[in-house]
Amino acid sequence: MQITDMSFVLDFQKRKGYVPYESPELAAYKTEYKSSPEGLWTWGVIIVAGIAYNPNLVPADQAPKSWKDLLDPRWKDAINVKVSTSGLQHVTWYMIRQLYGDDYWKKFGELNPRAFDSYVQQFDRTVNGQDKVALTAQYSGYLMMKAKGAPVEFVIPPDGVVAAPQPWGIVKEAPHPAAAQLFMDWFLSLPGQTGNAEVLLTHSARSDVPPPPGGVSINEFKVLTPTDWHAFEQTHAQFVREWNKITGLR
């Protein structure tokens, strides 16, 4: 099972929802990419996000270059984000808040951002000209759209791109536990992770896996991700409350 919100991953672990299985592939993963104790879950995917814009609507010299540039009033009613159920959006809120404080999101809320469930909706609106800019724009979505020739550009802020994990683990009372273990062995392996990166255009937590087609290595980014996931988990209710207010979903 994979969950894309670390708050739910840690809660599921507390509820003893995972069955321990120490795949031999775990040796290829850094300690911070694995559960404590090991064998409950492992980062199967790293999702990177930055800023995207439509170059047909926003000239390159006028495009946002940093997260702070997104506070410019000219993006009012022209910027989209993810909804509060997104683990990636929670990470973005958390990390930008650490960088710039609470005032950042208060000012951002004045832009009337539109929130959507899927990165596909975010990029569709940006490419179609309904919005000019996307915040928490997934790098994988950008690569997919760019490969199709869509008018979209990706901005790597100098203050860093946001990165969130997609942990994978085996649930208790799985109907076919042996098959689940075999799948985890394959998925966490070099061939499994390489195939996943090629198909989904995401990054792997394994250092020996090439970057997604058309993309650059995650090592070339300054990465913004929580170092204390338990502290991050404690902010979930606050994030949902504030984000729903910012996006008009309260």
Describe the function of each predicted region.
Residues L10, K68, K106, D124, ...:
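Solvent-exposed, polar/charged alpha-helical surfaces in well-ordered, non-transmembrane soluble domains
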